[in-house]
C-alpha cells in the first residue's frame, strides 16, 4: 500500500471536469484500489458521484491511498495528475 498527501492549489478545486478526469484515470487500474480522503471522508477514485461528494476545494489537504499490484505505476500517474491539474 502506498499513499501521498497533496494540497489542492487550483482556484476551482476539484470541479466536475477534473473529477471526471481523475475517475477516468483511476478506472484504468481495475485491480488496484485508489482512495481519496479529505478529513474524515473518503471515496474510491473511480466513483464519480462519491468523489464529487468530497467537495474538494482550493487549499484542502487530501490523502491518496493506492493498494494493489499496479500501485507503483498508479502512484506515478496519479501524482502527476494532481500536480498538473490541481
Task: Please provide the spans of the model-predicted regions.
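C-terminal structural segments of small proteins and small subunits
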Residues: 7, 53-86
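Short glycine-rich, polar/acidic loop-and-turn segments at beta strand-coil junctions
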Residues: 40, 49, 66-68
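Short amphipathic
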Residues: 1-10
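Amphipathic, hydrophobic secondary-structure cores in small proteins
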Residues: 43-55
Amino acid at each position: 500500500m502506498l499513499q501521498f498527501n497533496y494540497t489542492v492549489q487550483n482556484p476551482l478545486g476539484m470541479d466536475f471536469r477534473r473529477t471526471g478526469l481523475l475517475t477516468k484515470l483511476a478506472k484504468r487500474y481495475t485491480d488496484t484500489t485508489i482512495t481519496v480522503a479529505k478529513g474524515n471522508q473518503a471515496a474510491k477514485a473511480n466513483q464519480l458521484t462519491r468523489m464529487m461528494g468530497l467537495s474538494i476545494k482550493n487549499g484542502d489537504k487530501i490523502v491518496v491511498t493506492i493498494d494493489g499490484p499496479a500501485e507503483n505505476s498508479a502512484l506515478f500517474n496519479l501524482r502527476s495528475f494532481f500536480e498538473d491539474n490541481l
